[in-house]
Curated annotation (Swiss-Prot):
GO BP terms in the entry: lysyl-tRNA aminoacylation
Subcellular location: Cytoplasm
Cofactor note: Binds 3 Mg(2+) ions per subunit.
Residues annotated for Mg(2+) 1 binding in this entry: E407, E414
Annotated catalysed reactions: tRNA(Lys) + L-lysine + ATP = L-lysyl-tRNA(Lys) + AMP + diphosphate
Record-given protein name: Lysine--tRNA ligase
GO molecular function: ATP binding; catalytic activity, acting on a protein; lysine-tRNA ligase activity; magnesium ion binding; transferase activity; tRNA binding
NCBIfam families: lysS_bact (TIGR00499), PRK00484.1 (NF001756)
Organism: Lactococcus lactis subsp. lactis (strain IL1403) (Streptococcus lactis)
Family of this protein: Belongs to the class-II aminoacyl-tRNA synthetase family.
Lineage: Bacteria, Bacillati, Bacillota, Bacilli, Lactobacillales
Pfam families, per database record: tRNA-synt_2, tRNA_anti-codon
Residues reported in the UniProt entry to bind Mg(2+) 2: E414
GO cellular component: cytosol
Length: 494
């Protein structure tokens, strides 16, 4: 907890003004205030009207917001109030509002909240304004705002004190409004296709559903250690067993791993599961989600991102992982080979072989991550991941070395992960046990055995297609943002 700092001169003056308001019988931290308009509604309705037309109409309005600018001398003043939608100018005359109201205006500081009732008008300069008739003091700001005209420029302060960033940086404010709209549209898209939105536990006895290191905590009442979820997958698939058929969850997951421009320890995912579907159906669903967001939120398929044009319209490219490696690195993993042969290839291509690697599949994945990922700029579905790195995915019928799984890559980064779900409980148990062995050999991201989930599968789960999308990265793409911290209202800070 931050310590209370010593008051500077500005803060002392603001507290004096707070006491002056109280002495005048005015509550410096007011109560409910009813508006007739926000700033956007006023601009949309009246920006096209002339000064004379507005005078003829003699319309009145009631607005409220934070005082962002104030100027004027003597008996006339101008100011701008800022609400969620933007700003509206105030025109305040002492002979219109009276002595008491004009004193409120004169003594108001930037950052204070005011409610204003008055006539909707235009000034001689043509700016839409409210000519004040009555002012109501709503809240005293005891600290000054950051830089008046240039916004908040210190990056760390923007992240630690996001409220100041939102007040002073309209671009940042709009980015988070866009984030909310994106999430709403994803919900609308899924709901419209018959999916049920559900909620599953954040605290779990066993962290599963992804290859990641979890955060641990202790449940005092039950006296057991628990893990914060690293994915929502296993509980959602239990609901498929239970007959819910089409489910999704939008929520936070937690991974105790590194932080960089595209990773934060807590982040938002959307996972969905659909009975009787396979991974190719889920490719279509994924395309649909991205294209729906493009159409409804940003209004275009071609996005400017990281100095590149990304086209999310039409069919996304689809390529098998082995073919992608062959094309980029010139190494062919289609012919069957021993682990020793694959290890030799890895050393030839400067790929480190971890001690928990036990199969060719691990080597294939390392080749892909080192040589291929960064080349995938336009939306690309990479499918056919090795079985060893896909413990929850169904094996491919034609080549059981690989799975019916895909990842969506854009600009060299993963945006989605999906597969035809493994629904054979015997195979699932064997893969869990292989993961547990890898964990013993030092693989921090390997999971343990979730016997309860295996038991659920033993009751029968229909063929199912599942999807996971990283919402934060999706928002980054659609807002042209290259740092994940700029799309998280309160990113993790030391």
């Amino acid at each position: 907890m931050a310590e209370i700092e010593e008051l500077n001169d500005q803060m002392k003056v603001r507290r004096e003004k707070m006491e002056n308001l109280r002495e005048a019988g005015i509550d410096p931290f007011g109560h409910k205030f009813t508006r007739t308009h926000n700033s956007q509604e006023l601009h949309e309705a009246y920006d096209e009207k002339t000064k004379e037309e507005l005078h003829e109409l003699a319309l009145s309005g009631i607005v409220a917001g934070r005082l962002m600018t104030k100027r004027g001398k003597g008996k006339v003043g101008f100011a701008h109030l800022q609400d969620r939608e933007g700003q509206i100018q105030l025109y305040v005359r002492k002979d219109e509002v009276g002595e008491e109201n004009y004193e409120i205006f004169k003594k108001a500081d930037l950052g204070d909240f005011l409610g204003v009732e008055g006539e909707i008008m235009k000034t001689d300069m043509g700016e839409l304004s409210i000519k004040a008739k009555k002012l109501t003091f709503l809240s005293k700001a005891l600290r000054p705002l950051p830089e008046k005209f240039h916004g908040l420029t210190d990056t760390e302060t923007r992240y630690r004190k996001r409220y100041l960033d939102l007040i002073s940086n309209k671009e940042s404010f709009n980015r988070f409004v866009t984030r909310s709209k994106i999430i709403s549209e994803i919900r609308r898209y899924m709901d419209g296709r018959g999916y049920l939105e559900v909620e599953t536990p954040v605290l779990n006895n066993e962290a599963g559903g992804a290859a990641a290191r979890p955060f641990y905590t202790h449940h005092n009442s039950l006296d057991i250690d628990m893990a914060l979820r690293i994915a929502t997958e296993l509980h959602l698939k239990r609901l498929i067993v239970g007959g819910m058929e089409k489910v999704y969850e939008l929520g936070r997951v937690f991974r105790n791993e590194g932080m960089d421009m595209t990773h934060n320890p807590e982040f938002t995912t959307m996972e969905s599961y659909e009975a009787y579907a396979d991974f190719e159906d889920i490719m279509d669903l994924t395309e649909g989600i991205f294209q729906h967001v493009a159409k409804t939120v940003v209004g275009q398929d071609v996005l400017e991102y990281d100095g590149k044009e990304i086209n999310v319209g039409g069919k996304f490219k689809r390529v098998h992982m082995v073919d992608a490696i062959k094309e980029v690195a010139g190494v062919d993993f289609w012919p069957e080979m021993t682990f020793e042969e694959a290890t030799a290839l890895a050393k030839e291509h400067d790929i480190h072989v971890e001690k928990h690697f036990t199969s060719v599949g691990h080597i294939i994945n390392e080749f892909f991550e080192k040589y291929v990922e960064e080349t995938l700029i336009q939306p690309t579905f990479v499918f056919g991941h090795p079985k060893e790195i896909s413990p929850l995915a169904k094996m491919n019928e034609k080549d059981p070395r690989f799975t019916d799984r895909f990842e969506l890559f854009i600009n060299g980064k993963e945006y989605a992960n999906a597969f035809s779900e493994l629904n054979d409980p015997i195979d699932q148990l064997e893969r869990f046990e292989a993961q547990a062995k890898a964990k013993e050999l030092g693989d921090d991201e390997a999971t343990g055995v979730d016997y309860d989930y295996v038991e659920a599968l033993e009751h029968g789960m229909p063929p199912t297609g599942g999807l996971g999308i990283g919402i934060d990265r999706l928002v980054m793409l659609f807002t042209g943002t290259t740092s994940i911290r700029d799309v998280l209202l309160f990113p993790t800070m030391k």
